Amino acid sequence: MTTGSAHAVVAETHLPGTTGRVIREIFEQHLGNACGGMSFSVYRGGEPLVRLHGGSQERRASADDPVETPWTDETLAVMFSGTKGLVATVAAMLVDDGVLDVNAPVARYWPEFAAAGKENVTVAQVLNHTVGLIYTDPDPTDSFFDLTAHSEILARQKPVWEPGSKVAYHAVTFGYLLEAVALRITGK
């Protein structure tokens, strides 16, 4: 473990030559500019090649402010944009398995979603960010990890525009919407 101003980097690297050291230095540089915490891991064949984490679970005004709760391997984080490709890959796998039709209404898989004029919203409209549910209203404060809370709100919520008529990045809701569909299809 090394310590910088008000953060500590916990590092495990199993890479040849200087590669592990360079990755760690870059991580430490980013962490030194951050006011929170972060993790970075690389696995190959189920074995860790790089595992780095450090900083604070709280947002601080400055990277030099004291760390109240250290960032650990177990710290949960909302990835937002980082999940879009993963979620779309899961949808593609469900299509490939023959259990998801992107042209079908979301309500075929998630009946409660048909509320508030959304009965004809398709899975494709969710995938292409045209559904008009760009936020949850009301916002379930401090419930980023509560799929049930978000899916219940999104099922009842009216879109902010006619689905399919506009495109806007569904930064917060994309994962919740498609996770709710996948959960109802697969049961997990």
Predicted features and spans:
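Short, contiguous pre-domain boundary segments
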Residues: T2-E12
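Short, conserved catalytic-motif segment at the N-terminal edge
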Residues: E12-A77, R156
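Active-site SXXK
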Residues: R21-F27, G46, V78-N103, L178-L183
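Aromatic- and histidine-enriched alpha-helix N-cap/loop-to-helix transition segments
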Residues: C35, A77-L86, K118-V121, A168-Y176
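Active-site helix/loop module of the DD-peptidase/beta-lactamase fold
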Residues: D73, S81-G82, L94-P138, R156, ...
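Catalytic-site signature segments of enzymes, centered on catalytic residues
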Residues: D73-T75, Y135-K188
